[in-house]
Amino acid sequence: AVDIWQIPAGTIITRVLAQINVAGTGSGNIIIGDDNDDNGYVLAADATAAAGTVYGDGVAEVGVYINDTQATCGGSWKEYHASGKELKMDCSATLTTEATVDVMVFGYSFKYLG
């Protein structure tokens, strides 16, 4: 897995999208999550899809953090009260040629008073 963002304390992530810029060759799915769940945000984005394809915008593509099936999120988001977590991206197989992907993170910052 590759760390793509050190998530600051006081962050709420409401959505993560992966957009294919340059398709990879071979086979492989990209997953996006954090230190606790490697596909908590995006379950499986086809790394060989056409340029411009977006993943994480459909119900079948989002992980448990957005679907609210895990106790660590409230509503349809994940809260990070403390620092020390990273947003991570991984590929489930080795591609012959790597894909180029933009990752877009949507959310809020807050001051935790806990």
Features from the language model and the residues they span:
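Surface-exposed, low-hydrophobicity beta-strand/loop segments enriched in small/polar/acidic residues
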Residues: 1-114
